[in-house]
């Protein structure tokens, strides 16, 4: 690796990053508008009920009380759903930026160690804090899809910090359990999941940049020292619609020609593992198959 290779690599890797982050921020803004509208609706209905009580007393029931309460509950659930989606989008942006920043800093450090790049007069050290924040962003990203909204308080530094207060114990994904990414995709897709009770105490994996223990935490220190910036055994392939690396729980599409192959549960709206004999197609493949069926009928 030399300086020109690193420059070319990161020029290419970062070319789409601004557009990706901009798209994520626009999605968050759009959901913010939906949240605001839903809040106005249930607050208006709540005001109607309180106004009726002030006028007629608590013993007289509003003629549309049940209907109003049902609508209020519906809008509140919608707000909770949208807030979870906003957290997921924010963590996606954090993950993308953190990933590129970490690999860039480690590559620069390697070039300086090999004396291919003169050190800066005031070098930006890859501190323990930045490593911990990078690990936290990855773990927090996996948790955010299933996390319940947490009220903000004065002690929270950022919204992301609120979502990662308590790291849940994750199941080892089928993708992560594969011995090699080069295994036959048709064989690996036959096993959709690996139940958590079968791996109650998985052994830590220390060969690559990701070290899995009971909490699927990232051991950045040992990975950077042992195998360099990227890790020899790490699976750096990109999967799913979000085009990110494998993490958390994933499901494989049963279409052998699927260009994405594996999907994060949160990205395809899955909350529980499929049955062993259940066939599952990703939304993209399912849509294409449906279009082909319609063409045949016509």
UniProtKB/Swiss-Prot annotation:
One of its GO terms (biological process) is regulation of DNA-templated transcription. It comes from the Eukaryota. The record marks 239, 250, 254, 262 as: Histone H3K4me3 binding. Residues 140-206 are annotated as: Disordered. Zn(2+) 2 binds at residues 253, 258, 282, 285. One of its GO terms (molecular function) is zinc ion binding. InterPro entries: ING_fam, ING_N_histone-binding, Zinc_finger_PHD-type_CS, Znf_FYVE_PHD, Znf_PHD, Znf_PHD-finger, Znf_RING/FYVE/PHD. It is found in: Nucleus. Its main location: nucleus. Keywords: Cell cycle, Chromatin regulator, Coiled coil, DNA damage, DNA repair, Meiosis, Metal-binding, Nucleus, Zinc, Zinc-finger. PROSITE patterns: ZF_PHD_1, ZF_PHD_2. Zn(2+) 1 binds at residues 240, 242, 264, 267. The keyword Metal-binding applies. Residues 140-158 have a biased composition (Polar residues). GO terms for cellular component: cytosol; NuA4 histone acetyltransferase complex; nucleosome; nucleus; piccolo histone acetyltransferase complex. Residues 174-188 have a biased composition (Low complexity). A zinc finger (PHD-type) spans 237-288. Transmembrane segments: none annotated. Component of the NuA4 histone acetyltransferase complex which is involved in transcriptional activation of selected genes principally by acetylation of nucleosomal histone H4 and H2A. The NuA4 complex is also involved in DNA repair. Involved in cell cycle progression and meiosis. This is Chromatin modification-related protein YNG2.
């Amino acid at each position: 690796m030399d300086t020109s290779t690193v420059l070319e690599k990161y020029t290419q890797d970062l070319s789409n990053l601004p557009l990706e982050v901009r798209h994520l921020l626009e999605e968050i803004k759009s959901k913010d508008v939906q949240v605001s509208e839903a809040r106005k609706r249930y607050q208006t209905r709540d005001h109607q009920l309180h106004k009726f009580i002030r006028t007629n007393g608590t013993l007289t029931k509003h003629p549309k009380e049940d209907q109003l309460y049902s609508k209020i509950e519906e809008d509140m659930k919608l707000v909770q759903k949208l807030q979870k989606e906003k957290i997921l989008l924010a963590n996606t942006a954090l993950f993308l930026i953190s990933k590129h920043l970490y690999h860039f800093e480690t590559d620069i450090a390697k070039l300086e160690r090999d004396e291919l790049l003169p050190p800066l007069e005031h070098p930006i050290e890859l501190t323990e804090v930045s490593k911990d924040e990078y690990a936290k962003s990855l773990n927090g990203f996996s948790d955010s899809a299933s996390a319940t909204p947490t009220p903000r308080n004065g002690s929270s530094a950022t919204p992301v910090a609120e979502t990662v207060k308590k790291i849940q114990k994750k199941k080892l994904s089928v993708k992560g359990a594969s011995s090699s990414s080069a295994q036959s995709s048709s064989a690996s897709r036959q096993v959709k999941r690996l139940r958590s009770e079968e791996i109650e105490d998985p052994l830590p994996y220390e060969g690559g940049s990701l070290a899995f223990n009971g909490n699927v935490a990232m051991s950045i220190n040992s990975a950077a020292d042992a195998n360099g910036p990227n890790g020899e055994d790490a699976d750096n392939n990109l999967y799913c619609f979000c085009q990110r690396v494998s993490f958390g729980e994933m499901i494989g599409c049963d279409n052998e020609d699927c260009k994405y192959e594996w999907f994060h549960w949160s990205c395809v709206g899955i909350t529980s593992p499929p049955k062993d004999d259940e066939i599952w197609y990703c939304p993209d493949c399912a849509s294409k198959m449906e279009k082909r069926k319609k063409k045949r009928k016509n």
